[in-house]
Amino acid sequence: DFCLSRGLGDVYKRQLLSRLADRNTRGYTYAVPLVQGGVFVGATPELLVRRIGNRVVVNPLAGSAARSADPARDRTIAQTLMASDKDRREHAVVIDEVARALRPLCRTLDVPPTPEVVATDALWHLSTTLVGELADARTTSLDLALALHPTPAVCGYPTARAHEAIGELEPFARGYFAGFVGWCNVQGDGEWAVALRCAEIHDTAVRLYAGAGVVPGSVPASETAETATKFRTMLSALGLGSSVD
């Protein structure tokens, strides 16, 4: 949490959104006016679900590593992430649960056996794209988003126990963070992304949100560093540098 020297006018809000889009070309940039005033804004790399006609696409990301400006070092980081037993286990939990949620809703579902490594500007991620065909054409993109959310990537697993633990252990309310943002039209088509790397802005008050998954084998210092890297998305767009003290 911090305060700006002055509130964000409409022009600056548009500039902020433009900066986020320019610097995060591989994901989804969003800004949602809040009923209580202010705006919820961010840039997320993660597609929760897309539904166009009977085709369903889901692309969970789980398992991450900060990139390097040195090309050789950057390639090594990507290879190390792909070979990481801890990160592969974290990713598998998410994919298994997402597939379990989708199968009752799909006539067919293709689940690749292994993830791939994809890059954003700041991080490498393990990524798996699941593609299905709807069993019932009346199932909308919003229905699918509600069936999938929250995934283990943002809530943990088993879901009910993890949700209870979050309520007991996290010293703050997540608000809209780790929810989903997107659209659904009258035909049921739509696209929803996981609301990550974001901020709630009310006049001069700003609250940033970012996080990392914790599984057996996680190193607290590494997860803290990963979270700090994710904060850079909003910090740099706000013109506040890229470090978290």
Describe these PLM feature segments.
Residues 1, 83, 87, 216-223:
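Alpha-helix N-cap/helix-initiation motif
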Residues 1-12:
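Single conserved hydrophobic/aromatic residue that forms the stacking wall/gate
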Residues 2, 101, 234:
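Short alpha-helical functional segments enriched in proximate histidine and acidic residues
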Residues 6, 34-40, 98-100, 115-122, ...:
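A glycine-rich phosphate-binding loop feature that marks nucleotide/adenosyl-phosphate handling sites
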Residues 10-89, 93, 104-110, 188-211:
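An anion-binding catalytic pocket shared by soluble metabolic enzymes
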Residues 135-245:
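Conserved hydrophobic core element of enzyme catalytic domains
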